[in-house]
């Protein structure tokens, strides 16, 4: 998740090191481990729910990374999200590629957490599919729950963004 705050751009990461699932901030090729260090959070999802982003920013500014990305296995950014809600055919070039027409209402569908793929992991093609659908995908990570959110208030509910594969 890239978070742009006043001073520091933070790139969060979930990863496995020596068989333990952890999370931290990636700076170039070094990771500052945050597991259990910010509000007792044991995962990035936990950090977001505990509203620990500002505290993570302060911690990262004084604790440079010491773990190389060469020593970890990437995990999906948020391995256990509450919901994964997807919007399909949301840009015109992709609609043209699929020989479909633009719908009046967005095409909404869901994914399961187990379908996520982490950075540098292979994407498995289902047997029922002839090919993979190559497209740029982005995740919007919600930090605040809400219902009937006004468009002008929507950004207040977003904690970050990420490239996304599933």
Q: Language-model segments: what does each one mean?
A:
Residues 9-106:
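N-terminal non-catalytic cap/leader segment that marks the start of a structured domain
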Residues 1-9:
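Short, Lys/Arg-enriched N-terminal segments with co-localized hydrophobic residues
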């Amino acid at each position: 998740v890239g978070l742009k705050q006043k001073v520091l751009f933070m790139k969060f990461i979930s990863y496995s090191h020596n068989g333990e699932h952890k999370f931290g901030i990636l700076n170039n090729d070094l990771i500052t481990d945050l597991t259990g260090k910010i509000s007792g959070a044991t995962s990035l999802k936990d950090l977001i729910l505990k509203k620990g982003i500002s505290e993570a920013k302060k911690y990262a500014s004084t604790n440079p990374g010491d773990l190389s990305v060469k020593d970890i296995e990437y995990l999906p950014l948020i391995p256990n999200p509450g919901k994964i809600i997807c919007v399909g055919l949301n840009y015109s070039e992709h609609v043209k590629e699929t020989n479909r027409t633009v719908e009046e209402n967005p095409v909404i569908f869901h994914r399961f957490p187990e379908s996520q793929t982490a950075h540098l992991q292979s994407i498995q093609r289902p047997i029922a599919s002839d090919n993979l659908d190559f497209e740029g995908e982005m995740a919007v990570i919600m930090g605040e729950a809400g219902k009937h959110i006004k468009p002008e208030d929507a950004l207040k509910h977003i904690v970050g963004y990420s490239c996304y594969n599933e």
